Amino acid sequence: MTATALQNSLYPSFGVINSFSIYEYKDTEYEEYALSVLRLANDNLSQSIAHFWKLPFTEKEINYHLLSKLEPLLKILQKITLEEEVSQEIQREALLFIDNALTYKDLLTDYFEERELLLSNSKRMITPILIKNLDDEIQTR
């Protein structure tokens, strides 16, 4: 899932959800539209989670920053799902989306933390070798 695909999937649905009171779009095309967008976003997130290790580094980085910026919207979406006027289908899809988004963000967070730790350890391990090689090089000259 690219950041653009996620943005294109999510921002229109949040626009729909935030533009109208829930009761104004219930049983209209907007409810169906919001539901279809949530399903598409869930499918995209599920694919990203399932194929996490196949995603390029830059895509992971972009998605991490995008999901970080979406966190306030996830809180809004969670509040909206608690309203009685929201259909059970939308509640279910919205909660699944929130769960998938948080799971994916946790995966990304762990990935970047482990990557940073690995890079840090690699630098510490290679430094003595580089110093020894430099010393050997200096002594041979």
PLM regions and their residue ranges:
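Long, low-complexity or tandemly repetitive, helically biased scaffold regions used
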Residues: 6-138
